[in-house]
Amino acid sequence: AAVPEAAAEATAEAAPVSEF
């Protein structure tokens, strides 16, 4: 399921910095 950019940003803020 593709999540909108807004949700991705919110998830990035809440989740730890691991994607970078």
Swiss-Prot record:
Keywords: Secreted. It is found in: Secreted. Residues 1-20 are annotated as: Disordered. Detected in the hemolymph. One of its GO terms (cellular component) is extracellular region. Homopentamer. Forms a cylindrical structure with a central pore. This is Haemoporin. It comes from Aplysia californica.
